Structures are given as structure tokens and as C-alpha cells.
């Protein structure tokens, strides 16, 4: 029966409609369990990377820490590099969210990009130097997952939008490609961060000079 009334022992009783709710609940529970397992694997992998680095990280150890079979790791992440790519995108999203609350003028590239660098350095402190450098190193590695382009990352989107705003304000040439300029800026920044000494005044000064040089090169004369 799908509705209406039933006659039970001479009494008219509304029948209970048959619905798909139980099946939906089962699917919802399974999806929640899948996401919880994935999160455990992700957290265990990041912790292992912090101890051993990407190259030295043991997938079996990651799986054991997460309490899953080795194959479960590969079910959620095809390679160890995929974990770092996801971590990078999550960190970039945090940085962009923080930058969206900025007080600097939208076309003030120097202030915006300097602030961006400060947030990236804060991310380095959160993640630790080993994970941070491995994450940045993927941008220059042949093992970077196919299809993960820097220009499609949240941070790149923010930088490109900032350059485009400066173009609209007449501070950067409209003939320049904002997308290309954004990728050039971030590629250079990541290279400096991946190869330079960590947590030093000299590096902070170098990064400030880098931002100034890039912005001056973009600006209209």
C-alpha cells in the first residue's frame, strides 16, 4: 500500500505511506562515515609528512595511524602528492578569507601583496617547515598531480583579481595579462620560499623587496 486507509479488524486505520526515507538515511550515514574516514586519513598523512617528509612518508604507517587498511588510503588519495595539493588549497582558502577582510584599497597592489606574503608566512608556521617546503616544492616537481594548475588555485584567483582591479584604476597597464602576471608573481614567491632560509629577518626583507620589485614592474610609468 502507498497510502489511503486499511480495514483492520473492522476499524478504518490510516495506512502508513511507504517512503524512501530509510534508504536515504542509510546513504547519509555511509557518506558521513566516508568523510570521517577520509578526514582521518588526511590528518594522519599530514602528520606523517611533518615527521618524515613527503618522500620518506610511509603509506602503511599513515593507514595504521588512521585505523584503516593501506588500500583505503589510495581509495581516498591516488598518491601522497594529492594530500599535499588538498592541504595547499585549504590553506590558500584560509588566506583568501583573511585577505577579504582587509582594509587596504582594492587597487593598492603593494599593500595587498605584502599582506598576502605575511599570511603565507603564517601558514608556514602553522604547517611546519617540512610540510610547507614539500607543498611548495610540488609546483616545481614532475610528480605534481595532473590537472592541478597554479592559475586555478584560490590564492592565484585573489592575486589575479587584485591585479585586474589595479588595471581598472589605471595603475597597471591594461595591455598586460592579469592571469599571467599573477602566476609569475606566485611562482617567484614560492621559489623564494622553497629555497631560502626559514624564519629569518633577511628572508622577510628579501620578500618585501621581491614584492616591491614585482609591483614596480607592473605599474604604469
Q: What residue spans do the PLM features occupy?
A:
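Basic, helix-initiating cap at the start of DNA-binding domains
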Residues: 1-52, 56-65, 82
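Hydrophobic alpha-helical connector segments
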Residues: 86, 97-127, 178, 182-185
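Short secondary-structure transition hinges
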Residues: 121-160, 194
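Key DNA-contact positions within bacterial/archaeal DNA-binding proteins
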Residues: 71
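Hydrophobic alpha-helical bundle segments that form small-molecule/ligand-binding pockets
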Residues: 104, 152-181, 196, 218-221
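An amphipathic alpha-helix signature
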Residues: 42, 114, 118, 156, ...
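An amphipathic alpha-helix adjacent to DNA-recognition modules
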Residues: 35-43, 55-56, 67, 76-100, ...
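Hydrophobic/aromatic-rich alpha-helical bundle segments in the mid-to-C-terminal region
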Residues: 130-136, 149, 168-212
